[in-house]
């Protein structure tokens, strides 16, 4: 008969070892009835021992796993290769090491501790003393904190005293008293006479009017009547109005304008036009003031003045003006009523209160240094000898920017001032008319070799159209026209002469529109042609300088290599035009 199958986690010693469902997994011969303790079926159908660390099987036998320091002796006993010796307070009993302790040391929960009683306590792993004021721990020593009058003297507590307290020979604290204090009765008392008395153990003062004791503050006060007051804790006479005190606290009469004290008499002090010999009266001169029949001060007035009735039923003297003649009132002052074309000058250097009338001007009109009206002239306009407006002025020509018609050596091609470069720019509305020519005066271009096949001149301008230092042309040779020379003062703006940035954009590569290409001739000889390329707002200059321009012009003359040897570089004049920036 089969037994009930145990749970899956227990060993079933009854054959067969099959599951509750399904056929037997392995054949079996006889059912070995064995204890499940220490046995297991692993793998299925095989009876084996159930072992755990440090037990193991080795060569079919049960064996013991051993770590470092353990071994088996010849008798098969487990031994340790490390022999431990100890010294007191440690002791060894068989395989155990223990610690001998005595009070106050003890072992609690396997740890060595110190048994303590108050005021000792273990805090944060350290033995300390609990203390309450006045006991304290200072410099790792228990001490007593003191505060005056208690102090420590010669390692003993002592009492500091000062008069009237003192220590007697019997080491007692006594009080030294002087009149009116007394200690005759063994207690501190006061000797007193009237008006001081004692009532219910309290000192009081016998008083009568005008003295009284204020009920709310128990302070002695003085009752004051009319004309008397207490001020800054002092009893004094109450004064008001013109009565006061002098520097010696004497009562006096204060006097103001028109009054003074002389020989302890109050005197009316007057000045002209008043007189006070016997009575106060007004002195009148020969002016318009007079005393009328009603004994009132009145005024005589003539033409240009009149009296008018004010809103408060008073009469006021006013100037009579004729508004139709250009006069008017400005608040309380007479003013000129300026019409169209006239105004008042507020920018006068004479005085900020002086505003002369002047002609009101608009665009195109100004004042000269003499204050006369003149016409404002823009660029290209001037006055001729007759004073008429004319176009152009050769002595101050703001329509021509040039090098002069015949400049000195002013340009660098290969070396400083090795070339005379002529360039004239004339503003013609939205166009600029230009003439250019170049002549070598020194260096290798004064006698060219066969290796030279081109000459380039670069002009670079900043955002204001001012020639930059990194140009081939020297700055001081380039300015507005003044006769056959240039202005002495450097110019600051010539944007109107610059190539238009929309028409000739500064791009990474030159475009066809940026270039003006034509044929010119060496020395003006038609048998010696050269190609002139004028580039407007080109970018080739950025490879030669770190300072980038806003506008630029470059002029390049080129010819076949090997030609014109020993010749001097000199070009004929070439005229061209371009669209202006402004």
UniProtKB/Swiss-Prot annotation:
Q: Which cysteines are joined by disulfide bonds?
A: none
A biological process (GO) of this protein is: symbiont entry into host cell
Annotated region (Shaft region) at 45-392
- Region called Spacer, residue ranges: 393-398
Q: Where is this region: Tail (penton base attachment)?
A: 1-44
Residue numbers spanned by region Head: 399-582
Any Pfam family hit: Adeno_knob
Alphabetical UniProt keywords? Capsid protein, Glycoprotein, Host nucleus, Host-virus interaction, Late protein, Phosphoprotein, Repeat, Viral attachment to host adhesion receptor, Viral attachment to host cell, Virion, Virus entry into host cell
The record describes its post-translational modification as: O-glycosylated; glycans contain N-acetylglucosamine and may play a role in fiber assembly and stabilization.
Keyword tRNA-binding in the entry? The reply is: no
Q: Which domain of life is it from?
A: Viruses
**Segments crossing the lipid bilayer:** none
Question: Where does it live in the cell?
Answer: Virion; Host nucleus
Shaft repeat locations: 45-59, 60-75, 76-95, 96-109, 110-124, 125-139, 140-154, 155-170, 171-185, 186-200, 201-217, 218-232, 233-248, 249-263, 264-277, 278-294, 295-314, 315-331, 332-354, 355-370, 371-386, 387-392
Q: Where is this region: Disordered?
A: 1-23
Induction of expression: Expressed in the late phase of the viral replicative cycle.
Q: Residues where Phosphoserine occurs?
A: 325, 351
Could you name the Gene Ontology cellular component terms for this entry?
Answer: host cell nucleus; viral capsid
The task this protein performs is described as: Forms spikes that protrude from each vertex of the icosahedral capsid. Interacts with host coxsackievirus and adenovirus receptor CXADR located at the cell tight junctions to provide virion initial attachment to target cell. The fiber protein binds to CXADR with a higher affinity than CXADR binds to itself, thereby blocking the cell-cell adhesion function of CXADR dimers and leading to local disruption of the tight junction. Fiber protein present on neo-synthesized particles may thus disrupt the junctional integrity in order to facilitate further neighboring cells infection.
Q: Show the domain comment.
A: The tail region anchors the fiber to penton base capsomers, whereas the shaft, built from several repeated motifs, allows the knob to protrude from the virion.
Subunit composition and interactions: Homotrimer; arranged in a triple beta-spiral. Interacts with host receptor CXADR. Interacts (via N-terminal tail region) with pentons.
Misc remark: All late proteins expressed from the major late promoter are produced by alternative splicing and alternative polyadenylation of the same gene giving rise to non-overlapping ORFs. A leader sequence is present in the N-terminus of all these mRNAs and is recognized by the viral shutoff protein to provide expression although conventional translation via ribosome scanning from the cap has been shut off in the host cell.
Q: Which family does it belong to?
A: Belongs to the adenoviridae fiber family.
**What is the official name of this protein in its record?**
Fiber protein
């Amino acid at each position: 008969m089969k037994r009930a199958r145990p749970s899956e986690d227990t060993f079933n010693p009854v054959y067969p070892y099959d599951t509750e469902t399904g056929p037997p997994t392995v054949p079996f011969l006889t059912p070995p009835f064995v204890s499940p303790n220490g046995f297991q079926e692993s793998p299925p159908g095989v009876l084996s021992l159930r072992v755990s660390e440090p037990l193991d099987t080795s060569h079919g036998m049960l064996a013991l796993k051993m770590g470092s320091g353990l071994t088996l002796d010849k008798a098969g006993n487990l031994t340790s290769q490390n022999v431990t010796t100890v010294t007191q307070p440690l002791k060894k009993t068989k395989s155990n090491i223990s610690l001998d302790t005595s009070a106050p040391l003890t072992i609690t929960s396997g740890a060595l501790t110190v048994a303590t009683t108050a005021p000792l306590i273990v805090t944060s792993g350290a033995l300390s003393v609990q203390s309450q004021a006045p006991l304290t721990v200072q410099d790792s020593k228990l001490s007593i904190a003191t505060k005056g009058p208690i102090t420590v003297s010669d390692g003993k507590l002592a009492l500091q005293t000062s008069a009237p307290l003192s220590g007697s020979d019997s080491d007692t604290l006594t009080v030294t008293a002087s009149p009116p204090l007394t200690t005759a009765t063994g207690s501190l008392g006061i000797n007193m006479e009237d008006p001081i008395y004692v009532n219910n153990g309290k000192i009081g003062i016998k008083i009568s009017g005008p003295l009284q004791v204020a009920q709310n503050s128990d302070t002695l006060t003085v009752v004051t009547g009319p004309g008397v007051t207490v001020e800054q804790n002092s009893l004094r006479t109450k004064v008001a109005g013109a009565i006061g005190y002098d520097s010696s606290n004497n009562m006096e009469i204060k006097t103001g304008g028109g009054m003074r004290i002389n020989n302890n008499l109050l005197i009316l002090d007057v000045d002209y036009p008043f007189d006070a010999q016997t009575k106060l009266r007004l002195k009148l001169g020969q002016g318009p003031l007079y005393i009328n029949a009603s004994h009132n001060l009145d005024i005589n007035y003539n033409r240009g003045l009149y009296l008018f009735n004010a809103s408060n039923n008073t009469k006021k003297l006013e100037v009579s003006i004729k508004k139709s003649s250009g006069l008017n009132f400005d608040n309380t002052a007479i003013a000129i009523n300026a019409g169209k074309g006239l105004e008042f000058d507020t920018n006068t250097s004479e005085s900020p209160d002086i505003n002369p009338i002047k002609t009101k001007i608009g665009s195109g009109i100004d004042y000269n240094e003499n204050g006369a009206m003149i016409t404002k002239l823009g660029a290209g306009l001037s006055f001729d000898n007759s004073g008429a407006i004319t176009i152009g002025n050769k002595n101050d020509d703001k329509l021509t920017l040039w090098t002069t018609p015949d400049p000195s050596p002013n340009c660098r091609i290969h070396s400083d001032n090795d070339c005379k470069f002529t360039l004239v720019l004339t503003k013609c509305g939205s166009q600029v008319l230009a003439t250019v020519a170049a002549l070598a005066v020194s260096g290798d271009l004064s006698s060219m070799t066969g290796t030279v096949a081109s000459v380039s001149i670069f002009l670079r301008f900043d955002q204001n159209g001012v020639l930059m230092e990194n140009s081939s042309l020297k700055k001081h040779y380039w300015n507005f026209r003044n006769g056959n020379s240039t202005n002495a003062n450097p110019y600051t703006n010539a944007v109107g002469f610059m190539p238009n940035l929309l028409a000739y954009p500064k791009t990474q590569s030159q475009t066809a529109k940026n270039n003006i290409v034509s044929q010119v001739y060496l020395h003006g000889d038609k048998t010696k042609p050269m190609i002139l390329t004028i580039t407007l707002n080109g970018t080739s200059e950025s490879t030669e300088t770190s300072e980038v321009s806003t506008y630029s012009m470059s002029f390049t003359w080129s010819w076949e290599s090997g030609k014109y040897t020993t010749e001097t570089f000199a070009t004929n004049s070439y005229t061209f035009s371009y669209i202006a920036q402004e």
